[in-house]
A protein has these predicted regions:
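A short, aliphatic-rich alpha-helical micro-motif
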Residues: 2, 130-132, 186
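Glycine-rich phosphate/adenosyl-contacting loop at the front of the ribokinase-like
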Residues: 1-64, 69-80, 250-252, 316-320
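A glycine-rich helix N-cap at a beta->alpha junction
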Residues: 77-94
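Conserved phosphate-binding/catalytic region of the ribokinase-like
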Residues: 1-8, 33, 159, 208-320
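Conserved phosphate-binding/catalytic loop of the ribokinase/pfkB sugar-kinase fold
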Residues: 90-91, 101-146, 150
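Hydrophobic beta-strand scaffold residues
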Residues: 59, 85, 167-168
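Conserved phosphate/ATP/ADP-binding segment of small-molecule kinases
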Residues: 158-166, 172-241
Length: 320
C-alpha cells in the first residue's frame, strides 16, 4: 500500500520559550542575566514531529496555530525541518499556544502556559481523511485538546485503524480524571506511550508492568512507558516485555524528552524494526535532546542517533 507520508503527527503544537539557567525570578523590575534563551516547536505533537523529521521520516504536521507572530515562527520552523504543514490550520482570532519555561540549574522548571489554538482545534473531516493516508498516525496531547478530547479523538483513531495505519498515542500531564478520556481510545491504539508519572496518576501505582498491563487490558496493543532516568519499559499484548536502561549523559534540560522518545520510537516503527531496537532508538533520541535546551535540541540525524544508540554508556538504574 502506498502511503502519503511515514507519519501524521496530530495534536498539540506549542511554542516554547526557554531560558537557562534561571536561579530566581527577580523581585519587582529586577533583572537576571542568563546564558541562553531559545524558541522551540513543542507540545505533544510538535515535540514529536520534529524528531521524526530529523530521524529521516516523511512527516506531516496536523494541528493548529493562531493568527499571530508566534504562528509565523512556528510554521516557518516546521518547514525548515522539511515537515509538510499543508494540514496545519491557522485560526483567525486565536493566539498560538505558548509556554514560558525558566530552566533551573538542575534542569527542573516551572511551566507557565497560555492555552491557544491547540486547545480550540478540532480536526476537519477532509483533514482527517488526509491524515489517515500515512503509514503511522500519532495523536499527542490527550487531556489538553479540549475540543478534540472525547468522541472526535475516538473517531480519528477509528478511521486511522480502518485505513490501515499503525496508531500511537501520548498525553500530557495526566491526572486521575484523564483516564476517562484515554480508555475509549485504547481499543484503536497500537502503541500507548505515556510516562510513568502519567500512568501512576491514572492507575494509582508506579509499577511499570502493572500500569502497562492495565492499559493493555483496556485494549491497547502495546505500552511503552518512559521512566525518566531509568529508561523505559515496554509490554505487548502477546506477553513480551523488557526494560531499556537510559544512557548516561550530561543532562541540561529534560523539556521535550518524552516527546523525543516517542519520535524515536515512531522512527523505528516506520522502518519495521524490532520493538527492542525501536525502544533503544527512542532512548538514544531522548538522551541526545536532554543534553541541550528544549524540544529537539542537539538532535542532528538518524545516522548520528544510531551511532549514539550503539556507543553511549548506559546509566545505572535507580529504580529497584
Amino acid at each position: 500500500m502506498a502511503h502519503s507520508h511515514d507519519v501524521s503527527v496530530c495534536g498539540t503544537y506549542i511554542l516554547d520559550i526557554l531560558g537557562v539557567p534561571v536561579t530566581e525570578i527577580p523581585p519587582g523590575g529586577g533583572r537576571l542575566l542568563i546564558e541562553e534563551i531559545r524558541l522551540a516547536v513543542a507540545g505533544t505533537a510538535g515535540g514529536t514531529v520534529v524528531p521524526c523529521a530529523r530521524l529521516g521520516l516523511r512527516a506531516l504536521a496536523v494541528g493548529a496555530v493562531g493568527s499571530d507572530e508566534k504562528a509565523d515562527w512556528m510554521l516557518n520552523a516546521l518547514e525548515r525541518e522539511g515537515i509538510d504543514i499543508a494540514l496545519m490550520e491557522r485560526m483567525t482570532g486565536a493566539p498560538t499556544s505558548a509556554t514560558i519555561l525558566p530552566i533551573r540549574p538542575d534542569g527542573s522548571r516551572p511551566v507557565m502556559h497560555a492555552r491557544g489554538a491547540s486547545a480550540r482545534w478540532r480536526i476537519a473531516p477532509e483533514t482527517q481523511v488526509a491524515a489517515c493516508r500515512s503509514k503511522i498516525l500519532h495523536l499527542g496531547g490527550v487531556g489538553s485538546l479540549l475540543a478534540m478530547d472525547g468522541a472526535p479523538s475516538v473517531a480519528l483513531l477509528q478511521d486511522a485503524k480502518a485505513a490501515g495505519c499503525t496508531t500511537t498515542l501520548d498525553l500530557i500531564q495526566a491526572r486521575r480524571e484523564t483516564l476517562a478520556l484515554v480508555e475509549p481510545l485504547l481499543p484503536y491504539v497500537d502503541f500507548f506511550m505515556p510516562s510513568i508519572d502519567e500512568t501512576s496518576a491514572m492507575v494509582g501505582t508506579d509499577d511499570p508492568a502493572a500500569c502497562a498491563r492495565f492499559f493493555i487490558d483496556k485494549g491497547a496493543g502495546a505500552c511503552a512507558i518512559s521512566l525518566g532516568a531509568d529508561g523505559s519499559f515496554v509490554m505487548t499484548r502477546d506477553g513480551r516485555q523488557f526494560t531499556v536502561p537510559a544512557f548516561d549523559v550530561a543532562v541540561r534540560d529534560t523539556s521535550g524528552c518524552g516527546d523525543s522518545y516517542t519520535g524515536g520510537f515512531i522512527a523505528g516503527l516506520a522502518r519495521d524494526w524490532d520493538l527492542l531496537d525501536c525502544a533503544k532508538l527512542a532512548t538514544a533520541t531522548a538522551a541526545i535532546v536532554a543534553t541541550g535546551l528544549g524540544s529537539g535540541a542537539n538532535l542532528v540525524s538518524f545516522e548520528e542517533t544510531v551511532k549514539a544508540m550503539n556507543t553511549l554508556p548506559v546509566r545505572k538504574p535507580a529504580r529497584a
